[in-house]
């Protein structure tokens, strides 16, 4: 008997559209500092014939007709520790697998220092969205699911590097306040570079639980 998958990319994106006000807290072990970041995040649906969607598809030689539920994410915020500008925007384009609609690829523009990147996604039988993105030296696995229509929770990225070095992965807690409450977890990746420890924040919209952790959801007014 075939297992029924509770979520698909169209429903997932529809549930994610909206304006978010976020508060993210992080503990940077390398510097012994707690950081608080406040930001505003907007996710809006895009038409299939949007020029940004067409250009992103062309860059991967993908037929724009195969696109489902493209959207744009824009964020702007400030940190109580780092004076660097926290601001950006990117276009995300899901491409479902025609033979397996609960799997596919996710094209993303202007993500992390790269002009674009592509990840592979799938939905578990419980409705969890899982995205795996390969980078030059690492691969990030991200997960996200909805506890109910009003709560989206837990985003953690697990980074696996090709370099034999013990990395410290620290999840961040991010609670989204809007008309509905959403929670994400982000993480800071610490790695060795010329025998020094550098901190690198991975800011991704979308995303998941890869490490055991506890979390709490405040659904009050």
Swiss-Prot record:
Record EC number:
4.-.-.-
Show the GO MF annotations: lyase activity
State the HAMAP family in the record: Chrphore_lyase_CpxS (MF_01459)
Give the organism, scientific name. Microchaete diplosiphon (Fremyella diplosiphon)
What is this protein's function? Covalently attaches a chromophore, probably phycoerythrobilin, to Cys residue(s) of phycobiliproteins.
The UniProt keywords, alphabetically, are: Lyase
Gene name of the record: cpeS
Q: Which family does it belong to?
A: Belongs to the CpcS/CpeS biliprotein lyase family.
Q: What is this protein called?
A: Putative phycoerythrobilin lyase CpeS
Q: Which domain of life is it from?
A: Bacteria
Induction of expression: Induced under green light, it is part of the cpeESTR operon.
Q: Which InterPro entries does the record associate with it?
A: Calycin, CpcS/CpeS
């Amino acid at each position: 008997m075939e297992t029924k998958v509770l979520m698909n990319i169209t429903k997932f994106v529809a549930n994610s559209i909206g304006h978010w006000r976020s508060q993210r807290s992080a503990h940077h072990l390398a510097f012994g500092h707690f950081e608080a970041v406040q930001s505003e995040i907007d996710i809006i649906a895009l038409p299939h014939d949007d020029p940004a969607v067409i250009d992103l598809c062309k860059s991967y030689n993908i037929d724009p007709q195969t696109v489902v539920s493209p959207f744009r994410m824009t964020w702007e915020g400030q940190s109580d520790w780092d004076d660097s500008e926290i601001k950006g925007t990117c276009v995300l384009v899901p491409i479902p697998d025609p033979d397996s609609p609960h799997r596919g690829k996710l094209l993303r523009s202007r993500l992390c220092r790269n002009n674009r990147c592509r990840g592979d996604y799938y939905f578990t039988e419980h409705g969890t969205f899982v995205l795996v993105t390969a980078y030059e030296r690492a691969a990030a696995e991200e997960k996200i699911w909805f506890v109910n229509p009003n709560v989206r929770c837990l985003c953690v990225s697990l980074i696996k590097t090709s370099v034999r070095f013990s990395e410290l992965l620290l999840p961040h807690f991010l609670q989204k306040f809007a008309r509905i409450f959403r929670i994400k977890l982000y993480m800071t990746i610490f790695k060795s570079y010329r025998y020094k420890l550098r901190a690198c924040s991975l800011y991704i919209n979308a995303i998941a639980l890869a490490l055991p952790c506890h979390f709490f959801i405040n659904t009050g007014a």
